[in-house]
Amino acid sequence: MNHTHETIIAGRPMKVEFGKLGMLSDAAILMSYGDTVILTNVNASEKPREGIDFFPLSVEYEERLYSVGKIPGGFIKREGKPSEKAILNGRAIDRPLRPLFPKGYRNDVQVVCTVVSVENDNLPEILAINAASMALCLSSIPFTTPVAAVQVGLIGEEFILNPTSKEREESSLQLTVCATKERVMMIEAGGDEIPEDTMINAIKFGFDKCQDIIKFQEEAVSMFGKEKKVPELHKVPEEIEEAVREFAFDMISESMHITDRDERNAAMDEVKAKINEEFEEKYPDNMSDIGEAVYDMQKEVVRHMLLKEGKRPDGRAFDQVRNIGCEVGLLPRTHGTGLFTRGLTQVMTVATLGSISEIQILDGIGEEESKRYMHHYNFPAYSVGEVRPLRGPGRREIGHGALAERALEPLIPSEAEFPYTIRLVSEVLSSNGSTSQASVCGSTLALLDAGVPIKRPAAGIAMGLITSKDLTEEEVLTDIQGLEDFFGDMDFKVAGTEEGITSIQVDTKIKGLSEKVIHDAIYGARKARLMILDKIKECIPAPREEVSKYAPKTSTLQIDPEKIRDVIGAGGKVINKIIADTGVKIDIKEDGLVYVSSAESEGVKEAVKIIEGLTKEVKAGEIYLGKVTKIAQFGAFVEVLPNKEGLVHISKLDNKRVEKVEDVVSVGDEILVKVTEIDSQGRINLSRKDAIKEAEEENKQQ
């Protein structure tokens, strides 16, 4: 049976259809917003997965190119692995949903959001979060708290709900807010240096607008939602919990109070070894339960330390940033390098400058077709002192790379100001919390070292949160380290400049964040950011005046778009000859902007000269240095510009009478000539006599 429900959000219809498609899924819905449509299927395993200590939720965001009327490129002509954007969108759906499942729920759950139709005014990634929540709420899976998502734009001083494509172009803010009825669950933002108070008001605006979508979901559930199954929730047996607590709590507490990281880890390893020795014979089938009991006690000790004792594991004040180190120019042959160290977290970012032709071409369902600035993030096992096979980037690495990329995007100079493709690679050398924000700082250092004229330096910091079980007590922490991230309740990453915020990413392990926590985290991040920016400026106060001598040399020139065909030539003959003769790369835009780049500046100069010659118009009255190409009885033919030839009649060759042309010039000679006339057929008449006369007059005046 097909059920439908509809509402209006920001003047556009939002609709859900349930029961028509995917009959064998626990719940399958078709959810639309305008002409953007997402098919969402959710399913859960019948039984919990044995031997695990986590909730096995997987979220897939599947892009279908037919949704935008495209056929995939390449030989195979079908969608391949998910695009980076699809991976990021999948992560964004996962983060607000995961904390709202019951604690101890270990059934495998899969949420698949398939994008089947896209209208550019209505972003599929925002609709997908709402669709995932709606499908889970309508299903028999024990998920009962609706989550809503909206995008907030800012044009002038006005907040825009779910901005259209045109409004997004004008907006200085791209903010996604996910919320339940009571609290904010997730924040993603990119902005053009947005002031803190404006960002807080934008989040409040988004939270309020989420309530209409939550009401819409609740109405749908009351009308045609399935009855919820009673979940089989995993809980550590009371007997085991009490036994482990009695044996190990004091040892765990003592170990967790050690401020030095290595000593603390060594002490905890000893405690765990003693626990295993004590209980492995008595409870051989419950070692994962024992591990969970130890984790819960560690978390309890850390919470007590922070909330009741007012101490952090490493002895810092709640608003204190770890020691900062900044260095540039480490690698001799790269175009720019930045090394950023914060405590035991260390990231080296390397900048590479390339020609405009080296932009990344995107083949996806989004409006963006190419990227000129990109940031990649690598997190090898050695950064945490572990041994693992080296593989390609995972979802986390793609997410962290995109976050640091977004933080600096508003500060990158335009193509006209800086005609280079820019690639940054952040290598995490040591990780003890907040490597993504260390990558922002390392990227700033590398860009400045590479001579990229960024608008202003940027820095990032991660704020954390510790709460009591009933959420009545809350403490916001500045610059969380690994332990505080692991046992904490929030990861609130903020990057920006002295002027304002350029990116935010927030996720939580609890059922949402209060208004006070968001306010304190944003303003606490500003205080820390300004301190880090001072350290960056001490290291390198401004971009280097010139790019590295190893970077490609680039020049731009504007030509008449009508002349593009002259530069390219029939079948690319002319442009290919220029490239072959000078060793340059040439990129020509439709508006006639030409980019010429090469490792050698001489090649660039030569190519620019040729292109200028090909596109420059010969003007009557102008004097040119031309080359004699051919001699006839009646005069000499002279090339004044590439492929532009004129005739110097024998009577115009010299001030005195000339009997034979060869008496004055030979083929290959370079001579000054003046354009006396361009006739109706485009023929160019030249005079050497007039050019000599003008030159003599100029000499007399000097």
Swiss-Prot record:
Catalytically driven reaction(s): RNA(n+1) + phosphate = RNA(n) + a ribonucleoside 5'-diphosphate
Required co-factors: Mg(2+)
Record-linked CDD domains: KH-I_PNPase, RNase_PH_PNPase_1, RNase_PH_PNPase_2, S1_PNPase
Positions of Mg(2+) binding: D485, D491
Compartment annotation: Cytoplasm
EC assignment: 2.7.7.8
GO biological process, one term: mRNA catabolic process
GO cellular component term, pick one: cytosol
Protein name: Polyribonucleotide nucleotidyltransferase
Species in which this protein is naturally found: Clostridium perfringens (strain 13 / Type A)
Upper classification of the organism: Bacteria, Bacillati, Bacillota, Clostridia, Eubacteriales
Gene: pnp
